[in-house]
Regions:
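Bacterial N-terminal signal peptides that target proteins for export
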Residues: 1-9
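Bacterial N-terminal signal peptides
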Residues: 9-18
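Sec/Tat signal peptide C-region and signal peptidase I cleavage site
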Residues: 21-23
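Short, conserved catalytic-motif segment at the N-terminal edge
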Residues: 26-81, 102-104, 125-126, 163-173, ...
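Short active-site loop at a secondary-structure junction
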Residues: 41-49, 70-123, 130-148, 173-184, ...
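Loop/turn elements at helix/coil->beta-strand transitions in domains of secreted/extracellular proteins
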Residues: 45-48, 55, 147-148, 220-221, ...
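Short, surface-exposed loop or secondary-structure junction motifs
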Residues: 120-340
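Short, surface-exposed beta-strand/loop micro-motifs that present aromatic residues
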Residues: 333-334, 342-351
């Protein structure tokens, strides 16, 4: 068995942008193969899966390398951890609720709840799923948080409450004023969807909502929670010491990143997303609309100071569940996802639906 090396060892790559190939042409299979093998050598990746979408249609899907320490092959039907690509799926799901009049992007979440947020919990439904909202009792700024702020990483929360030194939930800046990556914001919006006013059409299970979308798109091996049918062909990972890391069987749907999927399934979702399937034109446009300027140098570490205005990228904004930008090929959006053993980039171009 080959020696295992680096962090990026299973790259779950959705590349409608086509690896820096010329804008006027799509890469052929041999050209993609050559680029993938170069990238795998450079990153020491043991496995990689790739999809290309053009004009809103899946034009190429393939997989390379191995999926586990037993050298089993990675295939286009291998289940992989989608990580934060879940956030884009959740944003797409929320926009269905917006179209149905159940959620308003710019109305505070407080208006969707039957009682003040800090009065919820502790409760058996909370462990390992939602945040400790009682911690916000002395900070009234929770009342300002809207669904758009949750989807644009501008709630003021840390990425997750449990990485705070005191493991409590805090608001670090006035909501809506800065971009600072936060899975906790997505979890809050999930809470509002699942425990909001039933008279408003909320009180909905996010796992059920996403499963309905996956079923409509023919994504048979994708879900926000683990099911036994995924065991037969699943990808593990490797840490930065080259040690195999078993796939985590996530039991609770979490909008911030619990999705398991395959490259074939995720290609179907990405194609539907760039086409705007199932959404009104206005809601599809909201996803990739510049909602909040990103003024820091990097996404991590969190809570960075703003760059001087002259050094800020003028085109870089948070969209809903994505980051939007303008480049040589026009307006586009991006989402990445990773943990200590996998990495997943998705890059899409609006004009060519690529």
């Amino acid at each position: 068995m080959p020696r295992l090396h680096k962090y990026l060892l299973i790259a779950f790559s959705l590349l409608p942008l086509s690896f820096q190939f010329p804008a006027q042409s799509l890469p052929t299979g041999p050209a993609i193969d050559a680029k993938v093998h170069t990238l795998m050598l450079r990153t020491h990746a043991n496995g990689m899966a790739v999809a290309v979408i053009d004009q809103g249609k899946v034009t190429y899907v393939d997989s390379y390398g191995i999926r586990d320490a037993e050298n089993d092959p990675l295939t286009t039907e291998t289940v992989m951890y989608g990580a934060s690509l879940t956030k884009t799926v959740f944003a797409y799901t929320v926009m269905h609720l917006v179209d149905q009049g159940k959620i308003k992007l710019d109305t505070p979440i407080a208006a969707d709840l039957d009682k003040p947020l800090p009065t919820y919990g502790p409760d058996p439904i909370f462990p390992d799923k939602y945040g400790p909202y009682k911690d916000l009792a002395d900070d009234p700024r929770w009342k300002q948080i809207t669904p758009r702020m949750c989807l644009t990483h501008s709630t003021g929360f840390n990425n997750f409450f449990f990485i705070e030194p005191d493991q409590k939930l805090h608001i670090h800046f006035d909501p809506g004023t800065h971009f600072s990556y936060s899975g906790e914001g997505f979890i809050l919006l999930q809470f509002a969807v699942e425990h909001g006013r039933k008279a408003q059409g909320l009180g909905l299970d996010v796992g059920d909502l996403t499963n309905a979308i996956f079923s409509r798109l023919g994504m048979a091996r994708t879900s926000l929670t683990w099911h036994n049918g995924q065991h037969a062909n699943v990808a593990d990972g490797w840490n930065d010491q080259g040690q195999p890391q078993p796939h985590s069987d996530r039991k609770k749907p979490r909008a911030a990143g619990s999705m398991n999927t395959t490259i074939s399934d995720m290609a179907k979702f990405t194609a539907a997303l760039v086409r705007g399937d199932g959404l009104t034109p206005a809601s599809r446009a909201e996803i990739s609309k510049p909602s909040l300027h990103i003024t820091t140098r990097n996404q991590f570490p969190l809570f960075q100071p703003d760059l001087p205005a002259s050094e800020q990228r003028k085109d870089l904004y948070a969209g809903l569940g994505v980051v939007v930008f303008d480049g040589p090929q026009g307006h586009g959006f991006y989402k990445g996802g990773h943990d200590g053993q996998t990495a997943n980039p998705m890059v899409c171009l609006e004009k060519s639906q690529r």
